[in-house]
Regions:
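Zn2+-dependent peptidoglycan hydrolase active-site motif and core
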Residues: 93
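Vicinal oxygen chelate
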Residues: 1-27, 61-65, 69-88, 106-110, ...
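A structural preference for short, hydrophobic beta-strand core positions in alpha/beta folds
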Residues: 56-58
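Donor-sugar nucleotide-binding helix/loop cap in glycosyltransferases
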Residues: 97-98
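Amphipathic alpha-helical segments
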Residues: 37-54, 113-125
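Long, folded non-catalytic interaction modules
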Residues: 102-103
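N-terminal domain-onset segments
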Residues: 12-51
Length: 167
């Protein structure tokens, strides 16, 4: 369910911060909103954001979640974007919808490599074994951080943006 217009910004910001977690080396980029119908969810966002500028753009599918993706760009302070997610497989997103219904389901993060140099205590607390194999997503190559429930919400780390070459 989409929040009321005056609650949209604070509600989405709170969900994104909660899912991003306390790690200061990870910056939340966009909140993923699970839905069974992209068009209906976009219409609901437009209705809730009446008075705010909003644009949408279909994005590449997310292989890790098994989702079709549509990026919503808004003028809501603090929440410039949201990513609508509709399952196209019986994968992670379908499980999330079955268990939790529509709503916040994922957050995409970027890692600040300068925050913790390799070998530091904080870097050692997030072992590579807790990350999925890389896959393609709406923002480039990504990995799932396996530190939450199997049915979500999910934390997805962008490891290479489109057009970048990974070693």
């Amino acid at each position: 369910m989409i929040p009321e217009p005056d609650e949209v910004g604070p509600s989405l910001r709170a969900a994104m911060a909660r899912m991003a977690g306390p790690d200061p080396s990870l910056t939340p980029i966009v909140l993923g909103w699970a839905t069974v119908d992209l068009d209906r969810a976009e219409h609901a966002f437009r209705a809730a954001l009446l008075g705010f500028t909003m644009a949408s753009e279909d994005m590449p599918d997310d292989a890790l979640l098994g989702a079709r993706c549509r990026l919503i760009r808004t003028a809501v302070p603090g929440v410039a974007t949201a990513l609508l997610l509709e399952p196209f497989t019986e994968g992670r997103l379908a499980a999330t919808l079955a268990r939790h219904g529509e709503g916040p389901a994922a957050v995409w993060l970027r890692e600040d490599p300068a925050w913790d140099p390799p070998g530091s205590a904080a870097a050692a607390s997030a072992p590579m074994g807790r990350r999925s194999s890389p896959a393609q997503g709406p923002f480039g190559t990504e990995v799932l951080l396996r530190d939450g429930a199997r049915s979500g919400p999910y934390r997805i780390l962008i490891v290479a943006e489109p057009g970048t070459i990974t070693p």
